[in-house]
Amino acid sequence: MKKTILFDLDGTLTDSQEGILKSIKFALEHFGYYVPDEETLQLFLGPPLVDAFQEHCGMTFDQAEETYFKFRERYGTIGKFENQVYPNIVDLLAKCKTEQYTIAVATAKPEHYAKDILDHFELTSYFDVIVGANYESGLLHKKEILEKALKLCGNPLTDENGRRLAFMVGDRKYDVEAANELGCISIGVTYGYGTEAELKEADAEYLCDDVDEIADVLDLEALMVRR
């Protein structure tokens, strides 16, 4: 049976924090809001930004939405390209392609931004499915995004012996929690924006400190399935 692997984008495939944080600061400063310290700003990397503005800046929903739209002005033109692919990601994607995984991106970033970024870094050809957030339709949170991606991939989650065939790779608790809830094997990466403690608390099945360790996990799981 064909296996599925889903990747988060920010903090997993690419290091995008420069463009995101500069665009957050741009939006906050435009409206005269206090800009949080760098440690707090790191918490904006992962969840929907409208939620993050409310949680960490004390905004109402309407204020958070207005600030998010201002964020998009800068991020959509400049910020999305203040970004770089993590080392060895291309090798990992090529390995997954060679081993005939169905490969997907499942990101809380707006889908059109995700596609622009993957095109910019010439990564699009590796992916069978790309699913991101859609603010207008209300597709915002990781579980729903992951559910849609799995449905589009079209593969079973388990084989006839109940062994799981779908992996989710991400750097934040949102990735791990959604993966666990939906029956995927959760791989937390510590080189992104979430801490090891956060990923452990979310019950990540594997923790990887670099991209090569993700490949090692896939090889280990393949050996376990063949036994």
What is each residue range found by the language model?
Residues 2-90:
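N-terminal helical cap/lid subdomain that shapes the substrate entry/recognition surface
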Residues 37-40, 49-52, 113, 145, ...:
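Hydrophobic alpha-helical segments typical of transmembrane helices
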